[in-house]
From Swiss-Prot:
Its main location: mitochondrion. The gene is PHB1. It holds the Pfam family Band_7. Protein with pleiotropic attributes mediated in a cell-compartment- and tissue-specific manner, which include the plasma membrane-associated cell signaling functions, mitochondrial chaperone, and transcriptional co-regulator of transcription factors in the nucleus. One of its GO terms (biological process) is mitochondrion organization. It is found in: Mitochondrion inner membrane; Nucleus; Cytoplasm; Cell membrane. Residues 177-211 form a coiled coil. Belongs to the prohibitin family. The mitochondrial prohibitin complex consists of two subunits (PHB1 and PHB2), assembled into a membrane-associated ring-shaped supercomplex of approximately 1 mDa. GO terms for cellular component: cell surface; cytoplasm; mitochondrial inner membrane; mitochondrial prohibitin complex; mitochondrion; nucleus; plasma membrane. This is Prohibitin 1.
Length: 272
């Protein structure tokens, strides 16, 4: 009797385990920010896109393919040529995500690794097309315009594959060794030219100052000559007297100086 009871319990437990396994295999979860596409062994990829949450499927017949629909970054380096045939190394940073409604088409025509298959090729295509419109100098001075043109063209191109580009930016832009050396030499030459121009301007200013000073000396000499011609020796004597008075005044301000007037035998001690 007990053996039959245990046998019944065993069968019930086995049946419960099988039923639990079946139920568990019929459930699947779609996490936040993700979507699922159902592949049916008999009908192929279903057009319905499954949202977040827990869902049922037919075990061994249907299979969920989970896609991450959040924006993800990707850096893509590209080597291309400018309008003036200079080698340009560019790195493009892209924030991308799939169009949710087009996930069945993306999975059918491209696959789960759609970003690996699509983004590098279309990025290289667009960058080569846009960069070829500018020469090396314009790529530096008009970088914002280049970035905007690349973003517009690449966004339009990605849309044909069911991708949305939330942001496109140029994060790295360098040129070949020859062009870099040429730019550095040009900058040095410009600095030398500025320095030479400063020296020339300084010399010109000094020359003008010398001319003005010479003209002033010439004018002063002319005035003195005219004064001498008009006043004769009287002007010279007057200047001598003024000079003597100035000397006497300076001597009188000095300590321990004795002044002896002309024509007198008495020494006078000037006040301190």
């Amino acid at each position: 009797m007990a053996a039959k009871v245990f046998e019944s319990i065993g069968k019930f437990g086995l049946g419960l385990a099988v039923a639990g396994g079946v139920v568990n295999s019929a459930l699947y979860n779609v996490d936040a920010g993700h979507r699922a596409v159902i592949f049916d062994r008999f009908r192929g990829v279903q057009d319905t896109v499954v949202g977040e949450g827990t869902h049922f499927l037919i075990p061994w017949v249907q299979k969920p393919i989970i896609f991450d629909c959040r924006s993800r970054p990707r850096n893509i380096p590209v080597i291309t040529g400018s309008k003036d045939l200079q080698n340009v190394n560019i790195t493009l940073r892209i924030l991308f995500r799939p169009v949710t409604a087009q996930l069945p088409r993306i999975f059918t025509s491209i696959g789960e690794d759609y970003d690996e298959r699509v983004l590098p090729s279309i990025t290289t295509e667009i960058l080569k097309s846009v960069v070829a419109r500018f020469d090396a100098g314009e790529l530096i001075t008009q970088r914002e315009l280049v970035s905007r043109q690349v973003s517009e063209d690449l966004t339009e191109r990605a849309a044909t594959f069911g991708l949305i580009l939330d942001d496109v930016s140029l994060t790295h832009l360098t040129f070949g060794k020859e062009f870099t050396e040429a730019v550095e030499m040009k900058q040095v030459a410009q600095q030398e030219a500025e320095r030479a121009r400063f020296i020339v301007e300084k010399a010109e200013q000094q020359k003008k100052a010398a001319v003005i000073s010479a003209e002033g000396d010439s004018k002063a000499a002319e005035l003195i000559a005219n004064s001498l011609a008009t006043a004769g020796d009287g002007l010279i004597e007057l200047r001598k007297l003024e000079a003597a008075e100035d000397i006497a005044y300076q001597l009188s301000r000095s300590r321990n100086i004795t002044y002896l007037p002309s024509g007198q035998s008495v020494l006078l001690q000037l006040p301190q």
